[in-house]
Amino acid sequence: MKRLLLAHRLLASALLTLALLLLWHGNAAALDPGCEEGEHLDGAGYLICMPNTWNGELLIYVYGYVSPTAPVEIPPEQLQPGGSAISINQFATDQGYAFAASDYGSNGLSVQTALVHIEDLVTTFTALKGAPSRVLLLGVSEGGLTAALALEQRPDLYAGGLALCGSYGDFAAQTDYMGDVRVLFDYYFPDVIPGSPVAIPQTLVDTWETGFYTDTVRPVITAPENAATVEELLTVAGVAHDAGDTDAQVAALETLLWYNVIGTNDASAKLGGQPFDNQGRVYSGSADDAALNAAVARFTADTAARATIAADYTSSGKLAVPFVTMHTRRDPTVPYAQATIYGEKVAAKSSQLLVDIASREVPFPFPAVSQTVQCVAGQEANVR
């Protein structure tokens, strides 16, 4: 037992070192990663990169949310987030790790397919390169939830992991958070966006990124006379923001509306119904809470959707291997509360295998890709 505890502590230390390297890694020239592409499970594409000198360990990258309308592939922009000078696969091989990633066979809400594909990726890697001494996971955004579930469910396969800004605490709460933003937008700015928060017209999905947002929504939320209303909307929705920073507020609202418009129908189809529920929600922080709560639209989640979330998208906090989470305290897309909730789950299991790193309070304006950039600025580590 003492040896097992020591091994876990050593691995936790290694993961923390990897996290700190992510924090401070500069733009130095990378070693040639020796990458190769191929196909594995059901024709899914993989990327495998080997370092010049392999330390024997494999780092699997579990990327974040991708639009359901995008091509199914390992998203290049998530391998090199924010146009950084070094890619994640180069970073991994610089540290001596073998690197591997796979597409998930689908986009949008892909947690369950991701779990299957990364597991098969280990088999594929082993057949091509030999068995790794340890397999570690690096999950970003939606991939952070996938990594948490994978570590909880397959500690025999994965030795530990690192997750950045994921909804690993309470996926149902994350779903409601996204829905609240759209419900409140429709209250404050009625008849701007067609459809409802739980039923998105396909024409809106098709045109959101090619003109509708830019031509119809953005002029409304950037109008100087609406600045106070936008800030109140974010306050009521519980979106982290800095008072008076209108550019960041608009960017946060743009991102959250993007997820609602682009992702809602896909999520409902995969969950077996629409998952958003605000029947019992009491909104506060507005100029007139009574009027807001009386008039805001109310929705009841489909029972099947919530049951699917509970069964397939909800972490337990039961860890048998070390896990490091990194999360921005001011994250407007996936609130820092997700890290807090997950920490409470782990603590309830009397585990000491979680390290939580809270990053600088720097809000960011973009979806999952930029979460990587912001999360790697983390500073404060708290071990539970």
What kind of region is each of these model predictions?
Residues 167-316:
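Accessory cap/linker subdomain of secreted extracellular hydrolases
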Residues 56-66:
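Short beta-strand element of the alpha/beta-hydrolase
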Residues 108-129:
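Alpha/beta-hydrolase active-site loop
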Residues 325-327:
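Short beta-strand/loop motif that positions the catalytic acidic residue
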Residues 31-54, 291-299:
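N-terminal cap/lid segment of alpha/beta-hydrolase-fold proteins
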Residues 354-378:
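Histidine-bearing beta->alpha loop at or near hydrolase active sites
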